[in-house]
Amino acid sequence: MAKTAIAYKEKMKELSMLSLICSCFYPEPRNITAYTYDDMEIKQLNKRASGQAFELILKPPSPVSEAPRTLASPKKKDVSLGEIQAKLEAAEDRRKSQEAQILKQLAEKREHEREVLQKALEENNNFSRMAEEKLILKMEQIKENREYYLASLMERLKEKERHAAEVRRNKEQLELSG
């Protein structure tokens, strides 16, 4: 019971004075379920916790309503043969101009492709030439190092032969003197 009284007090705070007085005269709330406009009618179907549902009814056009207006097409003037020929010549000039522009764009594109290809070939040739020069320098360096190594090896061999000859000579002298 206490909960009901508290809820009633809260409800009374929410309601305006006018609503309170009206609720005294009309115990049931006023229910407006239909709204009418010129060419449509809106009916409230039901209220739910998730929202409200409405039905929209469109009225058929009344027979008294205005007939749809037809737009009058602009009056055509007589076109002479000279004007037609001038228009055809202008169209031909536009077509030729467009073709010339397209051909110019294609020529520029081809020229650009040619330049790119030429640059790529140049870079490839430069790379090949530089790689070949590096390889030649490396081979020359290897050849010089090998020649130096062989020369030092021959020098050591000659030194050993001289030493061996000197040892033999000393040995022979020892045998002859001894």
Swiss-Prot record:
Gene3D superfamilies attached to this UniProt entry: 6.10.280.30
Biological process annotations from GO: cellular response to nerve growth factor stimulus; microtubule depolymerization; negative regulation of microtubule polymerization; neuron projection development; positive regulation of neuron projection development; regulation of microtubule polymerization or depolymerization
Single GO term (MF): tubulin binding
Residue ranges that the Swiss-Prot or TrEMBL entry lists as coiled coil: 75-178
A GO cellular-component term linked to this record: membrane
Keyword terms: Cell projection, Coiled coil, Cytoplasm, Membrane, Phosphoprotein
InterPro entries: Stathmin_CS, Stathmin_fam, Stathmin_sf
Tissues where this protein is expressed: Nervous tissue.
Name the record gives this protein: Stathmin-2-A
Subcellular location: Cytoplasm; Membrane; Cell projection, Lamellipodium
Residue span, SLD domain: 38-178
Family indicated by similarity: Belongs to the stathmin family.
Membrane topology classification: Peripheral membrane protein
Organism this protein belongs to: Xenopus laevis
